[in-house]
Regions:
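P-loop NTPase nucleotide-binding core
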Residues: 1-104, 113, 159-162, 352, ...
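Charged, low-complexity, helix/coiled-coil-prone segments
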Residues: 25-32, 59-81, 136-146, 182-185, ...
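Hydrophobic transmembrane alpha-helix bundles
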Residues: 39-58, 135-147, 177-198, 245-257, ...
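The catalytic "switch" region of P-loop NTPases
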Residues: 84-106, 110-229
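C-terminal leucine-rich, beta-strand-based interaction scaffolds used for sensing/assembly
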Residues: 231-418
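Short, solvent-exposed secondary-structure capping/transition elements
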Residues: 3-12, 115-119, 142, 164-166, ...
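Extended charged low-complexity segments that act as oligomerization/scaffolding linkers
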Residues: 1-48, 176, 184, 188-207, ...
Length: 418
């Protein structure tokens, strides 16, 4: 229904009666909503709820066409028959539409669970929506013949939530339908990355003339001692940003925004370069750490309640150092479990076992697993791929762990120093 209402005459190839099928359906939609504006998903749900009336309207507008043996009288009495009749009419029209170009419908906001809806109920809703989109994309839209363009519905969904849906053939569905945005990079090769190109593009906006092909270096000419002399002679502003971020465009944008705001507050915004001392300041580290924890809360709020998140935050109070061993983790976990037993009305699911809780920390990119005395560093976001959307944390006595730099200040782990 949303696709039928969205499509315009300019999208349809110039064929006899090419747009007539869409126009007919649109007239049904307009009549149903008394000439309302473009329907949202809630209106589509309303059609489902009042399917008898909608089936009757469709029948009137398609008068003279056969209805595959089903009558309006019978569909009014049976919800499934109503829905089948409505879907068939929409599907029949869409199969006859010849598009000039591809049309993609993006469905966002799914990874924000309303607090009044229980987690398991919401997962069932998303699972149903995912299966419906899969069915439309593969069984209907992909089979429209002789059309230059095709329609596609894309769910904007976090990998961890997709993994929670437990869909059949989930790996194949992801491989065939997902768009993998590769923002990851390394300290030595970041200048070839899409993330760095995005940052350059961001700084080039509103420039009278982009005379610098590498405008980032004009704004950030910081000369920073290398944190790894074996790998590189010096560090740069961008490597510093990578250390405290999760290699996401929004992280880079937020860092720039905080730096700019602090420089304005200090009255040094007339400078034509970003000030390194501002980046090193407690104010910056506090504000960025607050942003990092806010993002973490948004991620965890999909699964857990506000009260459970408050108890989760208490875990950081048991650490004196940001780096800890496997044995230290187990000792602190037991202390933390005692706190949960004494203060929580019931034991949260994330406290099922020491390993499951460590996995949650890893999935949330709160910790990095350090292998072979610092030779290898494993972050969940760096290990993820379309074929491995839920990498497992390394769990053995010879592994060290460290909290992410981005949350040091607000987690009371001290200052981050490069």
């Amino acid at each position: 229904m949303i696709f039928s209402d969205y499509i315009t005459k300019q999208d349809v190839a110039s064929l006899p009666f090419g747009f007539q099928h869409v126009r007919t359906l649109r007239s049904v939609i307009d009549e149903y909503y008394q000439k309302a504006f473009s329907p949202e998903i809630i209106n589509a749900l309303k059609i489902t709820d009042q399917s008898g009336y909608m089936a009757k309207l469709i029948s009137e507008h398609f008068e003279g066409e056969k209805t595959s043996g089903s009558t309006i009288e019978s569909t009014e009495q049976q919800l499934q028959m109503n829905l089948y009749y409505i879907c068939q009419k929409f599907s029949d029209c869409i199969r006859k539409i010849k598009l000039k170009k591809n049309i993609t419908i993006l469905i966002d906001g799914i990874d924000i669970r309303p607090s009044q809806i229980p987690y398991l109920d919401y997962i069932d809703c998303i699972r149903g929506l995912s299966n419906a989109c899969w069915s439309l994309n593969t069984e209907l839209f992909a089979n429209v013949k002789d059309s230059k363009g095709h329609c596609r519905i894309v769910l904007l969904l976090r990998p961890d939530i997709y993994n929670s849906l437990n869909l059949q053939n989930a790996a194949n569905k992801l491989a065939d339908n997902a768009v993998f945005l590769e923002w990851r990079t390394t300290y030595s090769d970041y200048k070839t990355s899409y993330l760095y190109k995005m940052a350059n593009r961001l700084l080039s906006y509103n420039q009278e003339k982009n005379i610098f092909p590498d405008i980032w270096e004009e704004y950030f000419d910081w000369d920073i001692p290398s944190s790894n002399l074996k790998a590189r002679k010096k560090d740069t502003a961008f490597t510093e940003f990578l250390k405290i971020s999760l290699s996401r465009p929004r992280d880079i944008q937020r860092i720039l925004s905080i730096l700019r705001n602090i420089m304005i507050q200090k009255g040094i915004d007339s400078q034509d370069k970003f000030d390194y001392s501002v980046f090193q300041s407690n104010q910056f580290q506090n504000e960025y750490s607050e942003y990092f924890l806010s993002s973490l809360k948004d991620q965890l709020s999909f699964y857990y309640s506000e009260e459970e998140y408050i108890h989760f935050r208490k875990f950081f109070d048991y650490f004196d150092s940001p780096q800890f061993s496997f044995d230290e983790y187990h000792n602190i976990y037991n202390q933390y479990l005692d706190y949960i037993m004494d203060n929580a009305p019931e034991i949260p699911e994330f406290m099922e076992s020491p390993k499951s809780f460590l996995q949650l920390l890893y999935d949330s990119n709160i910790i990095v697993a350090i292998e072979k005395d610092g030779k290898y560093f494993h972050f969940s976001y760096r290990e993820k791929s379309p074929s491995n959307i839920a990498p497992m944390v390394l769990y053995s006595p010879d592994i060290q762990y460290r909290f992410h730099y981005g949350l040091y200040k607000k987690a009371k782990l001290g200052r981050y120093n490069n």
